[in-house]
């Protein structure tokens, strides 16, 4: 049996992670063990069978699904008044995850969510102090925003999402906890609203561009033209995976089957070659959920 330690997160980044986050990791008992050879064999067979089935595809037609899901979180929040009730249900689906290039099984409550938040916070807490305004696009329930606000309550946080339920979540939670610096706004990746002013601000996405497949041209153009100070993505990026590696190959097939984000890094590299942006970092974190390594980091800025 192993425990997630700060070095598991630190080893994937070049900067020193926040002492506050280190303390949080140390106080969180995230226990796991790698799958045995027999378990890994069963996992791979099951994965292949999943890929042979009909999987729900991401895209524009899924908005009603997200509206329903975020409304469910809101109803739970109204009963508990606990921001943790905003954590999406997909973080609670199973006890299989990925860490340090291994498939693992967890033995701790909300393992997937906590591990995910450690990797996200480790990077964002390095950059948030440099900006007055922080924008999350595709923020869902707003759970990242409220968690980050605990570290940086003097900053202004904004969460954009195409779901109206998302804005309701943020409004209700902000009222309940007495927060005046977290606000929601409606934003559709497929039809970006240029009235949303992100100039010189920190912009980030966490597994939300995932949902737009190849249709990222409009939102990428919006990001470039709106001149944010910095853009950080935690997204499924097939270009960094190795199709000669079995687990990477299966992940790529899963991306394709679900119509997840495609060719986004390729588009960024083209923009960089044209002198329009500068890519500062592309980094595999080697952690993920049961079926995918879905949070490769890309950091870039408009020129």
Task: Label the model's feature ranges.
Residues 228-239:
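Conserved beta-strand signature within the Rossmann-like core of class I S-adenosyl-L-methionine
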Residues 112-130:
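Conserved alpha-helix/loop element of class I SAM-dependent methyltransferases that forms part
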Residues 246-272:
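Conserved Class I S-adenosyl-L-methionine
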Residues 1-118, 248, 270, 274, ...:
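N-terminal accessory regions of S-adenosyl-L-methionine
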Residues 136:
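Class I SAM-dependent methyltransferase core
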Residues 143-191:
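Class I SAM-dependent methyltransferase SAM/SAH-binding core
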Residues 140:
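Conserved glycine-rich SAM-binding loop
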Residues 201-215:
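A short SAM/SAH-binding and catalytic strip from SAM-dependent methyltransferases
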